[in-house]
Design a protein with these regions (language model features):
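NAD(P)H-binding glycine-rich loop region in Rossmannoid oxidoreductase-like domains
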Residues: 46-103
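Active-site Tyr-X1-5-Lys
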Residues: 147-177
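Mid/C-terminal beta-alpha module of Rossmann-like enzyme folds, strongest
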Residues: 231-283, 317-318, 323-333
């Protein structure tokens, strides 16, 4: 199988490329030239990649030849949300997602042998900030203007809606389209979300964030890859699919289980005002920590998909073990 991954030079692309490449599939990553060059110099994260092809995410070029004849396209392109939401970054987040998605659709539409499935990154952030009930694809409430949610959080939701709308508008009648409403994908890769959270725990700072009631949705890297395989194989599934473990849990419990898995006896909590100051210093937004994302994988479960890591406690132990193992390997290299 040939898998093409536009925007695949980041953490998620690395996770997918390693897994699919190890299975013997041909993995081609499309990346902006600086990203592609950096990834090429870092062999561990980009294991499994047959080749990295340059693209600008804005214009058709030689990269489109890779799409023609591919079996699957997994579009991960988009400016990172881990930044301050000023006017420049807001425009970049919207433009990079909408423009690249439209471009991928154009390449697929022009292909003589289009891929049979287009897996398009979206986000679980599209759902409302809520504590009372989980959001699945059938009954979940899309966010925007809900009580208790800061108005500035609406921006991320509108970005996600524009992303999915662009996918829906793409005229690719010979290619099945799936929007991946993904939760945070946890892997031991350095610089990823798990590595960031674990760094807090290792420094004694991994306590409750805010009041700790906000739900954290997540998925282990192995289940993320397995879910992609399942979606590729099930020709009857299209549209939005929640790619998240079935066990979201409040932040206080989430961090407690992570501390337990690492063996950290304490973790200092962070109030909302402390998080606000930290977000400014780290050039990010508190929404990434304080929004309640209670998302469950309704369609995956209904279709018979089984999770290797359905509960965070087991996933946290496995990820901590993997992080330690990789640290030892790097020291011994």
């Amino acid at each position: 199988m040939k898998l093409v991954i536009p925007g695949g030079t980041g953490q998620i692309g690395s996770v997918v490329a390693r897994a699919f490449g190890k299975e013997g599939h041909e993995v081609v990553v499309l990346g902006r030239t600086p990203d592609a060059a950096r990834a090429a110099r870092t062999p561990r994260p980009m294991q499994g990649v047959a080749r990295i092809v340059a693209w600008d995410g804005a214009t058709l070029g030689e990269w489109a030849r890779e799409v023609d004849g591919a079996d699957v396209v997994l579009n991960l392109a988009g400016r990172s949300v881990n930044c301050r939401y000023g006017p420049t970054n807001r425009a970049a987040m919207v433009d990079s997602r909408v423009r690249s998605t439209r471009l991928v659709g154009e390449a697929i539409a022009r292909a003589a042998r289009p891929p049979r499935v287009w897996l398009q990154a979206s986000t679980a952030t599209i759902y409302a900030h809520r504590y009372d009930a989980p959001n699945d694809e059938a009954t979940g409430i899309l966010g925007g203007g809900e009580p208790g949610s800061p108005e500035k959080w609406d921006f991320s939701i509108e970005v996600a809606k524009a992303w999915e709308r662009t996918l829906a508008e793409a005229a690719t009648p010979r290619t099945r389209k799936v929007a991946l409403r993904s939760a945070m994908t946890m892997s031991p890769d350095r610089g990823g979300i798990f590595d960031t959270l674990l760094a807090l725990v290792r420094r004694g700072l991994g306590g409750t964030s805010g009041d700790g009631r906000q739900y954290v949705s997540w998925i282990h890297e192995r289940d993320f890859v397995r879910a992609l395989h399942w979606l590729i194989e099930h020709d009857d599934v299209d549209g939005a699919v929640n790619v998240a473990a079935p066990g979201p849990l409040p932040n206080a419990e989430f961090m407690r289980e992570l501390r337990k898995a690492w063996g950290a006896p304490i973790g200092l909590p962070a109030s909302e005002w402390m998080l606000a100051i930290g977000a400014v210093l780290m050039r990010t937004e508190t929404e990434l920590i304080l929004k309640s994302r209670r998302v469950v994988p309704g369609r995956l479960l209904a279709g018979g998909f089984t999770f290797e890591f359905g509960e965070w406690s087991a996933a946290a132990r496995d990820l901590c073990d993997a992080w330690r193992r990789e640290s030892r390997e790097r020291r011994g290299a």
